[in-house]
Amino acid sequence: MSTTVIMHTSEGDITINLFDDQAPETVANFVGLATGEKTWTDPMTGEKRNDPFYDGLTFHRIIKDFMIQGGCPLGTGTGGPGYDFDDEIVPELKFDHPYLLAMANAGLRRGMDGKIHGTNGSQFFITTVPTPWLDGHHTIFGEVADDESKAVVDKLESVPTDRSDRPMEPAGIISVEVVK
């Protein structure tokens, strides 16, 4: 059984079907952050928190004919939940159509243990066109479920941005509701 979430945004609701079977750790992380069941570290205070992570955050990066990106607690693209985890790349899941939900990351990094690891945390993006150059680099863990939700993604993608791809007017996530 796959998990369904409704992302309530400033432009309307986006229903997303998550790929529990293909990306179980990523789905568990996203759902845990959305509900507050997963502990995260506030980047401003350093305090551990267990409240819904995504509530009130923004889509801090919007690139027309590419994607909308959110999930940064600082609103800059540099913040996260205070931890990271590895990719769950499934070769059968490809960026060959729009409206896919995937983890944003900073690529592979060498950790303190000397091993290479992934840099997934809380940031995600929803594609608005096929993006095959991303295959194998980002964990795909869901898909926008219906035409009404796709229209909301399209509205968000159309928000005016500055030269750094930051929205010139707020484009926000009100909350993420897990409906299972």
Where are these regions (language model features)?
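Cyclophilin-like peptidyl-prolyl cis-trans isomerases
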Residues: M1-K180
